[in-house]
Amino acid sequence: MVSSRPRRRKRASATQLYQTCKAAGTCPPDVVHKVEQTTVADQILKWGSMGVFFGGLGIGSGSGTGGRAGYVPLSTGSRAVPPKSLVPDVVARPPVVVDTVAPSDPSIVSLIEESSIIQSGAPSLTIPTEGGFSVTSSGTDVPAILDVSSTNTVHVTATTHHNPVFTDPSVVQPIPPVEAGGRLIVSHSTITTSAAEEIPLDTFVVHSDPLSSTPVPGTSGRPRLGLYSKALQQVEIVDPAFLSTPQRLITYDNPVFENVDDTLQFEQPSIHDAPDPAFMDIITLHRPALTSRRGVIRFSRVGQRGTMYTRRGTRIGGRVHFFRDISPIGAADDIELHPLVASAPHTLETPHTLETPLDTTDALFDVYADMDTIDDDAAYATFSLHPADSTRISNTSIPLATVSDTLLTSGPDIVFPSIPAGTPYLPVSPSIPAISVLIHGTDYYLHPAYYLRKRRKRILAHQYVAT
């Protein structure tokens, strides 16, 4: 089996080596002498050519061409070469005759031919026999006006309008410049004083003053940090020193004057063991950031690892997101409120059988009741409320006090109309008769205090209440 030999690469020539190594100054001496023609042979030719001249034989360091005539054999002579005519074969032009100037000839030579000289003199007048202008004369003193304008007349008119709102009437306006040709007719009116016209203007800026004493500038959206992308490794740190002195988790040195709120740079040796294995090969630790994620406050820093080195000294490594959860964000606590003034409980019965204790101490009083006639003995009153369309009717029972300790006052009575029952029963529309006071409506309701605080009824003899 024949083994394949490695292919031999072509070596660089001296010229190529000189071009690459001359700027750096690392060229070998033989390459420099060969390219710059400073070898021993070149020096001999340079100094010897000063005393010896070989003519056009072509002997030298150049290519051997034998000179201009080339190589000629010594035994034979050179062949004759017919001369070539530089001027092509054309018809010869006649020779120019040159006249000689004799000594007796004038020294002024005329350069203009006599045939081109025009004799000066008064030209003869030619009187036309036909044509001309017809002039009509009259005996009056009015001068004649002749229309000598052409038929193609262009009329240009310039009109200027002055607005008294923006023009001061006391200033005389000059005639506007007009750049045109032909006949120009420029007219302008006399400037007179006139009253200014009121033009309604729209207000674009409605309110330029701040709406508050301390206006709050508009806040722009916070940039997205992108801490949870696939390009970052997520590492949770348990050590609390990560919040205050993160450099202690990366190196054993003690940088006294470093600010932990800025980006930290670390120069690690090739073999280094970090105090915390999670911070191995960390060369850059960026500034901290506080974020909220999943109901907790998170302290985050992004670090850059320097795992590999290149020949140029560049460090290559991944990016890591170090975080630590500080505290959870809990829900708002329910604060139990207690009444400041104790009061008697009251029960409100609704159609849904829901009992609600009411405090009537701070409730609104009846507009028909007097502040001096309010009875505080009705401590435990139970009443029921039903909607207007319910068939159930209930009364409010209030224990009455004796006549001796009660001040009797007369107040307005509300008389509810009633429909007498008849036979047969006829349908009545509406089913509920109209009354002067409505306690149920579509857009309002009666406050519960009005149900509880009723006005005092007129008490007659034998403890009966007037209805």
Swiss-Prot record:
Location relative to the cell: Virion; Host nucleus; Host early endosome; Host Golgi apparatus
Alphabetical list of InterPro entries matching this protein: Late_L2 (IPR000784)
GO molecular function, one term: DNA binding
Short name of one Pfam family: Late_protein_L2
Domain of life: Viruses
GO-annotated cellular components: host cell; host cell endosome; host cell Golgi apparatus; host cell nucleus; viral capsid
UniProt entry keywords in alphabetical sequence: Capsid protein, Cytoplasmic inwards viral transport, Disulfide bond, DNA-binding, Host endosome, Host Golgi apparatus, Host nucleus, Host-virus interaction, Late protein, Microtubular inwards viral transport, Phosphoprotein, Viral penetration into host nucleus, Virion, Virus entry into host cell
PTM comment: Highly phosphorylated.
Disulfide bonds: 21-27
Positions occupied by motif Nuclear localization signal: 1-12, 452-462
Presence of keyword DNA-binding: yes
Gene Ontology biological-process annotations: microtubule-dependent intracellular transport of viral material towards nucleus; symbiont entry into host cell; viral penetration into host nucleus
Quaternary structure note: Interacts with major capsid protein L1. Interacts with E2; this interaction inhibits E2 transcriptional activity but not the DNA replication function E2. Interacts with host GADD45GIP1. Interacts with host HSPA8; this interaction is required for L2 nuclear translocation. Interacts with host importins KPNB2 and KPNB3. Forms a complex with importin alpha2-beta1 heterodimers via interaction with the importin alpha2 adapter. Interacts with host DYNLT1; this interaction is essential for virus intracellular transport during entry.
Function: Minor protein of the capsid that localizes along the inner surface of the virion, within the central cavities beneath the L1 pentamers. Plays a role in capsid stabilization through interaction with the major capsid protein L1. Once the virion enters the host cell, L2 escorts the genomic DNA into the nucleus by promoting escape from the endosomal compartments and traffic through the host Golgi network.
Family note: Belongs to the papillomaviridae L2 protein family.
Protein name as annotated: Minor capsid protein L2
